[in-house]
C-alpha cells in the first residue's frame, strides 16, 4: 500500500494540472455493477460509516482508517480507472459511489463528481444519509455536491425512530430531513428499504413509510431489498458478534406485501 501511495504522487491526468491533493480512502471498486443505479455502473466502495446496521453486508467498510487492503486514491485516479469502461455505459450507466457512507468523504466525492461531469459521466451516490445536516460546513458542501450529482439511492431503513435506532444505533430525524431537502431541490432519488423480519418488516411502519414517500416530489423508484446473510462471514472474520443469527430472509409473501404497501416492484405507483 505504501508503494502505491508513493507512486500516486507522480500521477497526472493533464500535463498542466497536477493530481488533486484530495484523496479518498477506497475499500474496493467493481467494474460492472448492475444493481446500484441505472445501466452498467463502475462502483466505488469508500471507507467510513458511523451507523452499525445489524444486517450490514459490508462491516469491513465501517472504519475510516480501513485495513491493509485499503488504498488512498485521488479523484483523477478513480475517474481514469472508471473511464476504461465508458463504452459499456451507453444505456444510462456511469459511476456510483457507495460504501461505507460516501458523505463522510464529501470533499473527495465533490471533486470526483466535478471531474466526472466534465467528462459527461452519470453520477450516483448510494447513501443512508446519516451525516446530513443543514449546518455548515457540511451543508454548503452538500449543496455544491448536488450540482454534480444525477441520482441518489437513499436507504430509508425504518420510519419509526426507535426501531431505526435499534437497527443502526441512530435515530432517523436528519435522514428524513435529507429526503425532504432533496425533494425541495428536485434531485432524483430512488428510495430503498431493506426488509428484515421482526426488524424492519411491520405493516404499520411500511404504511407510514409509504405516506412519507408520497410527500416527496422527486422519487423515481422505490425498491424493497430482502434481507440476506451473504455478508455474515465478514462479521465472523472481524470478530464481531452477528446478532441476527436466527433471522431468516423474508418469505415471498412478506416481500410481496412490502412491495405492495410501498408501491414498489410490480406495484409501482403511476403518476
Model segments located where?
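N-terminal [4Fe-4S]-dependent radical SAM core
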Residues: 2, 9-72, 84-91
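Conserved AdoMet/S-adenosylmethionine-binding subsite of the radical SAM
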Residues: 79-87, 91-94, 99, 103-225, ...
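Auxiliary Fe-S-binding modules of radical SAM enzymes
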Residues: 4-35, 80, 190, 195-271
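N-terminal pre-catalytic segment of deacetylase/amide-hydrolase enzymes
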Residues: 70, 77-80
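Short glycine-enriched, charge-decorated loop/helix-capping segments at active-site entrances
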Residues: 61-63, 67-69, 165-171, 239-247
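Generic domain-boundary/flexible-linker signal
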Residues: 37, 55, 64, 106, ...
